[in-house]
Amino acid sequence: MASLLKVDPEVKLKVDSFRERITSEAEDLVANFFPKKLLELDGFLKEPILNIHDLTQIHSDMNLPVPDPILLTNSHDGLDGPNMKKRKLEDREETFQGTKVFVMPNGMLKSNQQLVDIIEKVKPEIRLLIEKCNTVKMWVQLLIPRIEDGNNFGVSIQEETVAELRTVESEAASYLDQISRYYITRAKLVSKIAKYPHVEDYRRTVTEIDEKEYISLRLIISELRNQYVTLHDMILKNIEKIKRPRSSNAETLY
């Protein structure tokens, strides 16, 4: 079959070397890195910063004071009766356009520093999981034999493993999107507070979003740990079929 396609011997040697490197790295990931990482993340979940029960402790100062109300008089020369009422309604509509903000009174509006600290620890863990899953996925894909009739149950287990690894990659990538959406949503709300400083609901919404993000970050760390547990367990239970898909009779997946 090799004669049907001419392959440069030097290139083939480099490809074989790459396959060996991927195999060695992936097997070490499954056997050693995954269990160590799940224990590390489990320990992270027990740290005090991730076990705050009173969520008011993660609230941050808006640094946007409520300005004194501006007193407006609705009396206009030469206007009284119905004309004056009409002018009052027009003035009221004009005052709801919000405040033009050219500079913040107390300087830059900072993010919630406690959440930023957690995010800066979580993001590298997310990227690491994506990278390691990609390596293990490539390893399993390289182990899939050529398509032929007969006992393909082991191949189906390999494909199932690849699908699970791909799902974990996608979910981990969605965590990064979630963090970006938090920053964007919070920035828009803070801008609203700057424009409408007297509206308390905007201020309350920012604290609600911070609380929600804190809970979400803890959930993300839990999911990262659980994904390491699941992948480690699934691959170990099926390692014989993954490495030698057609070496024995069909067995159940687990």
Swiss-Prot record:
Gene3D superfamilies: Proteasome activator pa28, C-terminal domain, Proteasome activator pa28, N-terminal domain. Keywords: Acetylation, Proteasome. The modification N6-acetyllysine is found at residues 6, 14, 195. InterPro entries: PA28_C (IPR003186), PA28_C_sf (IPR036997), PA28_N_sf (IPR036996), Proteasome_activ_PA28 (IPR009077), Proteasome_activ_PA28_N (IPR003185), Proteasome_activ_sf (IPR036252). One of its GO terms (cellular component) is proteasome activator complex. GO terms for molecular function: endopeptidase activator activity. It holds the Pfam family PA28_C. Implicated in immunoproteasome assembly and required for efficient antigen processing. The PA28 activator complex enhances the generation of class I binding peptides by altering the cleavage pattern of the proteasome. Homoheptamer. This is Proteasome activator complex subunit 3.
